Amino acid sequence: MKICSFMLFLLFFINKANAGSIEMDYSISLGNFYGYTDYSSSTPLKYKTNNLNSSLNAYTKLSYNINYDYKASLISYIMIDTAKEVENYNQGYWGEEFFAEFESPTGVFTVGQDYNVAYNFSVGAPNAGPIKINNTELTNFITNPNWYKKGSKSSYKTLNSTYINTDGASFKLNYVTPSVLNTKLGFSYIPNTNSSAGLVSKDSLYYNDEAYVFGLYNYFYLKDYEIETSLGYGNYKNNSEEYSLGMSIYRKGWTLGASYLKTSAQTKKALLTLQDAYREGHAYNLGLSYEIGPLTTGIAYFNSKSDKFSNQNEIISFSNSYKYNKYTTLSLTLAKQNAKDDKTTKGYATILGLEFAL
């Protein structure tokens, strides 16, 4: 309701007298995945070896073009998932982003449930298929004792991404400058960092504290190479300070990318514990992909570690996707994960995917 009121205020205040145009954009996708997992003999417990997962994703954007320079929009992303759970990990059966956006010559403003500017700017290892290397859906097929989320309860003993995503899609205010010399700057203010898509548990002492995030994005051409870079900084009050950087290089179908995230705990209000050890740690990824016609193939590596505890994750994935037509995409992912807690959980997964898009 607050977002809708804000949107109506913008439309009324900026262009009361002039009639503009309205446009709408949308997309809907349905993903169906089957994964077979083989756990090593050293894995202490017996987990599921056959996992099915279906997800429905919908995007809508309703825009009012006030004039050539000004546009106001309402944007939503909705996700419904049938099986985001392997033993102890559940990212949530429902997820959403909903925010208002205002574009002007002075920049882009958004208010609502959205990711922070550093996250939105981030570049790194490319995704060659539906199973991403950051905040990976691989956890739907191979259990990970370092990442736990169920309902309002969560525990992250290591980082699950090289992008700043501690606040997830919580309510926030974002501002992004116009592009100058192919460079954009951004700022996010987050009044409450708890989010079902983030890392902060509602049981923590700092879950309702504010945060500030800054981001920088740049792209340029060097002969035949297209190069993207990103930098991010986040200050989560009483929680952590976070620094991120990333780079992506593209040439003739090939994409090489890498990114890094470092966190340092702020312990004045809440001491670091094993359950939120991501607050003092680091993560990096590296990936290479190649796209030719309807086929994309790639390999990616992800590593995250707690600096104060022995917990660590290592993921290697080989992904392939084939766009059969404009509506249908087939995929095959082979992945390996080592998750070190008090014991080591090691698993191998083969994941088949069938996706439909409108």
Regions found by a protein language model. Give the residues of each.
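Outer-membrane beta-barrel architecture
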Residues: 59-61, 99-101, 174-176, 215-217, ...
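Sec/Tat signal peptide C-region and signal peptidase I cleavage site
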Residues: 14-19
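Outer membrane beta-barrel
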Residues: 21-34, 49-194, 208, 218-220
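Transmembrane beta-barrel outer-membrane domains
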Residues: 21, 47-55, 89-93, 164-168, ...
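Detector for outer-membrane/organellar transmembrane beta-barrel domains
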Residues: 209-317
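Outer-membrane beta-barrel "beta-signal"
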Residues: 104, 214, 346-358
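Repeated loop/turn-to-beta-strand initiation elements of outer-membrane beta-barrel proteins
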Residues: 68-72, 106-110, 181-185, 222-229, ...
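Transmembrane beta-strands of outer-membrane beta-barrel pores
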Residues: 30-38, 66, 76-82, 115-117, ...
